Structures are given as structure tokens and as C-alpha cells.
Amino acid sequence: MMTRTATDLARASLEAVKAGKRDEWLALFDDDSIVEDPVGPSALDPEGKGHKGAAAIARFYDTAIAGIKAFDYEIERTCLCGDEAAVLVTFRITAADGEPRVTNAINIYRRAPDGKLAALRSWHHGSEE
């Protein structure tokens, strides 16, 4: 099997979310991975330390992603350097409250030595469409 790059993992992550495939998305991460979405303190992560480990990442999915009614994205640009990919992406979602939103983000995906995602860090700003 060919080793996936961080860019491949980024696309796989986005496609799994778009398709609503929770288990497929969670399988992209290793046991010690961290998700910071967004980076810094937020309603889902008041201390801004991220969601670390399989159980915390699963809770993040269930709380932040599972309720999204519609999800689409457009990758504007990707920069790959070693085991990291910086992805400039525009998300178009319909949130759980039924409101459409457009969010521009810079996501950093870091590939672990085992070929899974070691980290997903997202900087974003949202606005209603």
C-alpha cells in the first residue's frame, strides 16, 4: 500500500466529514492525536488545549460535526512540507440550527510516522451567507 501524504489525509478527512462517515473520519487519527478546531479557547474547548486522544476526538465529532445538516468545501490552496499540509479551505455548511454558514479556514494536518493523522489544527472565521 502506498503511504499517504498529509495532503492525502487532509482530503480524506474532508471527504469523510462531507459524507457523514464518523468511523471513517475517526480512523484517520492515531491514539495520541490532537484536534484543535478552532485553535485556542472556544465554547467546545474553553481552555484551548485541544481534544487529545481517540475518546476526546470522538466526543468532538459527536458535539461539533455530527449535527451539521449539510457540509461542502472548496480547497483554495494546499502547501505540503514534509509531514505537514497547510490547507486554505472554504466551508459551506448548514448548521444544526438550520442556518447556512460560510467559514474560511487554514487547516494544518500533520502526518504521524504510522501514516495516520497526528494533528489537525484549524484557524477559522465564520460568517452567515
Language-model segments: what does each one mean?
Residues M1-D32, E129:
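Short, low-complexity N-terminal intrinsically disordered segments enriched in polar/charged residues
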Residues R4, D23, L28-G82:
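A solvent-exposed, acidic/Ser-Thr-rich amphipathic alpha-helical stretch
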Residues G67, I93-V102:
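Short, cysteine-centered beta-strand-loop-beta hairpins and adjacent loop/turn segments enriched
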Residues V102-E129:
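Short beta-strand edge/turn micro-motifs at domain boundaries
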Residues Y61, L88-A95:
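Short beta-strand segments that buttress and anchor functional surface loops
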Residues D32, L80-E84, Y109-L117:
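Short, solvent-exposed coil/turn segments at beta-strand boundaries
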Residues Y73-C79, T90-R92, N104-R110:
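Hydrophobic/aromatic beta-strand elements that line small-molecule binding cavities or substrate pockets
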